[in-house]
Amino acid sequence: MKYGFIKVASAIPAVKVGDVIFNTQQIEEQIALAEGKGVEIITFPELSITGYSCQDLFRQQMLLESSEQAVMMLLDFTRKLDVISIVGAPVIAGDLLLNCGIVIQHGQILGIVPKTYLPNYSEFYEKRWFASAQDLRDCEVRYAGHKVKLTPDVQIFQTFDGVQFGVEICEDVWAPAPPSNKLALAGADLIFNLSASDELIGKHHYLKSLLSQQSARTMTGYIYSSCGFGESTQDVVYGGNALIYENGVLLSQSERFSIEPQMVISQIDVEKLRSERRTNSTYVNAQRNIKYSVLGGQFNIRNIEADPTENERDFVLEREVNPHPFIPTSSDMNASCEEIFNIQLMGLAKRIVHTHAKTVVIGISGGLDSTLALLVCVKAFDKLKMNRKGIVGVTMPGFGTTDRTYNNAISLMQSLGITIKEISIAKAVTQHFEDIGQDASVHDVTYENSQARERTQILMDLANKMGGMVIGTGDLSELALGWATYNGDHMSMYGVNASIPKTLIRHLVNHVAESGVDEQSRITLRDIIDTPISPELIPADENGNIKQKTEDLVGPYELHDFFLYYFLRFGFRPSKIYMLAKKAFIDSELERVKISDNDPDSYDEETIKKWLKTFVRRFFNQQFKRSCLPDGPKVGSVSLSPRGDWRMPSDAVSAIWLQEAENL
């Protein structure tokens, strides 16, 4: 396991009903293929040695003995292979015939797992031939030259490097209390399901929903293999399904109704799954003293004797990585944007009602953040059936304000029908510079922050005067980087954008531009989207254009949002985030969709390293600003509220994170 990833496979081999030699040879071909591709664990369909649809032939001693001999052949074949293989076969235990999954590696049987729930309804008659694991008592059987312990309890298999997995069989996952529930609560990271599920109209969609839900509920990687072409079509059809999920997300799936053997392979992020479990107190509380067996503690998986550092250098991530993890997929974009707006406006509406505020006061700069906050205010007032004139938009031109942003601010406020106030900060800030002895020609941090704090003072005093509340405009990305003036734009009475990352804000504003405003507002919003991000605290250039561009100073927001997502959501270390970023922004086979025309066409490794180090350094250094944030609604899975999702001491030391980032 490297960077927390393990490579798994689900195979659908060719099958002939009752021909154990042919079936075993087909399984061997798939195992060899998986070994060559670096797969660490592969699973096959239910009763894959014999074929599932043997029916009363399972009562024939000839078939049962031949099946056992075929497993011995398979053991011999795998003697020098590292891949762990899970195959299906009938196993006799005393007077019981069990439908089992057999886990093998290096020519050894690591364990045998009997099926718990036997379907005996409609087209299924498994109880005619097989007994349930619930009928079994702990015992030891001799099978395929091995002494193997059988138990009705769930069994956990543990690889050499600590990955834990369990096995369930077909109907088990359809039951009200699947064995995978107990397996996951006992520590299984992965669940392998050997299945023989026939095709019925609508069943495939239901199956995928079921597996996705089970993977999400148990926070596991779920690897499913169901038999296909070659099984008997006497009464039903087996279309073949190989599916791999990670915490509810479909990573890979086979072609349906294929007449050829198939295999799907994916890398599952076990580290991410474990992070999800650790942070989910409900999951932890559900864990009980479950009776289970831990098997295979001494067996190895691929490359376990190699130098770990060498392994990580050789590691290649084969799955795609979304460069914009905060942004909804195109098919869900409109619905997701609408949902986000509703969360924001409901949070603000409740605060307005609770405080009996007559007005809300918001600074309008003509930039993205204040635009989104204003749109939320408008929607909240409409929801509460309040007059939009109760929204007081204040534009406060300063030394760096450009005509473009000023005109956009005025135009947007006019078209939305709110109250407009214009208060220049130039005179007040100039007087302040004289009072504190600041040279106005020195454009340092004091020069910049004085302007931000003057604007906040104006907004706060206006809110007091008008019986209103100041609406904060700062976003999640700025909070992560500390790109806000302490007690300046950092402070408000309610921050509606506090958990919205910068990359998502463009899409939210664009959603409104396309669907929720008049033509003049639409034109203005589109120009705001195309405007470079800037606090405009430094005078414009000689042509009157924005000179101070945020992303030139702290780095591209699409990179920082990527870093933030994996750092905060899963607690990944810098080396893993860097590896994922390279895949997402450099090595991806997918066409990259730029968030903005201002984004670079591409990134190189040094650029990613540079801004990753900046992110780590600023994230730690700027925690003191996040420790005293105003209230604001949580919207997504990542938030920096000190009262909820992120509690970190302001004087924490970043040394170990920075050291790893420096060594990339």
Regions found by a protein language model. Give the residues of each.
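ATP/NTP-dependent adenylation/nucleotidyl-transfer catalytic domains that generate, transfer
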Residues: 6-7, 23, 161, 218-220, ...
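Enzyme catalytic cores with a strong preference for nitrogen-chemistry domains
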Residues: 1-361, 379-388, 420
